[in-house]
Amino acid sequence: MEHTTTFSIGNEGREVFWNAQHFEPILFTLTAVALAIFAYGLYRRWKLWKAMGKEEIRWDKLPARIKSLFVNGFLQVKTWKDAYPGIMHGLIFFGFFVLLFGAIFDAGEFHITEPLFNWSFLRGNFYLGFAFLMQFFGLCVLIGILLALFRRYVLNPERLGYKGKPDNTADDAIALLLILGIIVTGFLISALRIHVTYQQAPWEWVRFVSWGIAAYALAGVETSTALALHKVIWWTHTFIALGFIAYIPYSRLLHMITT
């Protein structure tokens, strides 16, 4: 799919598959595989729940159920009883929620509104605000994950255990490290792109975390080296993100969907 939009001051934006144009078909294939694994995992869980569960009318008390879904599912009120875990969980949950919708926005423009309606909405001031929010909430998730790792593996409060046994399972570490990997590689991908294209796209300072990495950590890196590193980290980010999706139904991460 060809996208030849020219960006400039007043028409700010970014090229979605920058430095990775030829990877698009492979990415779609791998995404289909990850989604198939995800769907199969959900199907297995559903069969297990159906075999173990009791018949129950789920449409009774609908207003109360909707309220509970909003209060406990979206607002995560139960996690705010204690400050540390409440803040930690809020940073991760709400940050990831915004990043998910950001990815949907990106994909919606690239695959639907641009090719079908010739409409690009991630442009100008809207793009600048969008890019800033993606960096801000990405940073929120990063802080939340670091707080979670510190709490679980340094503080390790007793209530994280079960019946006197520690609850630091490999599943917990995998889940936290996958999310950490997605965020860190996402920042690095943007930083490498900014390092190469900052003269053509000076507005990318709104991606303040990646801009800082590009300005300081990548200062002096040759363009050819940055391009090569970008491809490596782009693929690393892709495999981690798709692995995360595929892993959800087989781990405790499933509670993001079921609670």
What does each model-identified segment do?
Residues 2-259:
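Membrane-embedded alpha-helical bundles of multi-pass integral membrane proteins
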